[in-house]
A protein has these predicted regions:
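C-terminal regions of RecA-like/P-loop NTPase motor modules
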Residues: 1-16, 25-117
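Active-site beta-loop-alpha junctions enriched in small/polar residues
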Residues: 22
Length: 117
């Protein structure tokens, strides 16, 4: 019901609504989300209608256990669903600035050298 209501509002008012969803807890096998594993559509917790009704689904991942501060502060972005283009996959990176609390544009390739992202 909630997702259908949100969809109706977006169409009625020609707006984009961003919805934040938590991830399912995963088993012990493989890389964890805390270690920077990018979520998939199936990792989204909650109603299946989130996956079905959404026009776009974006995923963000950050390795909070990394030793290097630069790596801990680097966020990977990925498009999991795009109803408009159908294109999915890696969408770049951004950096969290603890001093300002802001996200900055992606890192250049030379800055990525040596980072496990």
């Amino acid at each position: 019901k909630v997702m259908n209501d949100l969809l109706r509002i977006t169409k009625q008012h020609n707006v984009w609504i961003g919805l934040v969803s938590h991830l399912r807890k995963m088993g012990t096998a493989g890389q964890s989300f805390e270690e920077g594993r990018l979520p998939t559509v199936d990792d989204i917790r909650g109603s299946g209608s989130i996956k079905q009704i959404s026009h776009d689904i974006l995923a963000f991942a950050r390795n909070i256990t990394a030793e290097k501060e630069e790596e801990r502060n680097t966020i990977k972005l990925s498009v999991l669903k795009s109803r408009y283009t159908g294109k999915t996959g890696p969408a770049g990176t951004c950096k969290f600035d603890y001093e300002t609390g802001r996200l900055h544009d992606g890192l250049y390739d030379d800055m990525l050298d040596g980072l496990n992202i």
